[in-house]
Amino acid sequence: MAQQSPYSAAMAEQRHQEWLRFVDLLKNAYQNDLHLPLLNLMLTPDEREALGTRVRIVEELLRGEMSQRELKNELGAGIATITRGSNSLKAAPVELRQWLEDVLLKDH
C-alpha cells in the first residue's frame, strides 16, 4: 500500500473537514427551507443532472431488474459510473441500504 506524505494526509483531512462543513451548511439550509437555493448556488446544472442520474442508478441497482449494460443504455451514463455506484452500494452500511430501499422503492 502506498504511503501518503504528511502533506497529502493533511490535505485529505482538510478536504474532509470542508465536506463536513458543507454537509452542516446543507442541514442548516434544510431547516430554514433554503436548501434548493443553496444547491442551485453550489452546483452547476451539469452537477445537479449528474446527481439526479446517480440517484436513478442507485434506484435501479436496488430494484435489480436491469443489467448494468441495460442501465447504461437507459440512462446514458458510463459503465464506469454504474460500476462505481454498484460497488459503493455493496460497501454501504446495511442501514443506509435499507433506508434507500424504503425511500426509493416505496411506491414501485
From Swiss-Prot:
Main localization of the protein described in the UniProt heading? cytoplasm
Q: Which residues form the signal peptide?
A: none
Alphabetized Gene3D superfamilies for the sequence: TrpR-like (1.10.1270.10)
Q: Name one GO molecular function term.
A: DNA-binding transcription factor activity
**Pfam families in the record:** Trp_repressor
- Keyword Glycoprotein found: no
The keyword DNA-binding belongs to this UniProt entry's keyword annotation: yes
What the entry lists under InterPro entries is as follows: Trp_repress, Trp_repress_bac, Trp_repressor/repl_initiator, TrpR-like_sf
What are the UniProt keywords, alphabetically?
Cytoplasm, DNA-binding, Repressor, Transcription, Transcription regulation
Compartment annotation: Cytoplasm
Residues annotated to bind DNA: 68-91
Question: GO CC: one term?
Answer: cytoplasm
Q: Name one GO biological process term.
A: negative regulation of DNA-templated transcription
| Taxonomic superkingdom | Bacteria
Record text on subunit structure and interactions: Homodimer.
Q: What's this protein's function? A: This protein is an aporepressor. When complexed with L-tryptophan it binds the operator region of the trp operon (5'-ACTAGT-'3') and prevents the initiation of transcription. The complex also regulates trp repressor biosynthesis by binding to its regulatory region.
- Tell me its family: Belongs to the TrpR family.
- Identify the HAMAP family for this entry: Trp_repressor
What is this protein identified as? Trp operon repressor
The gene for this chain is trpR
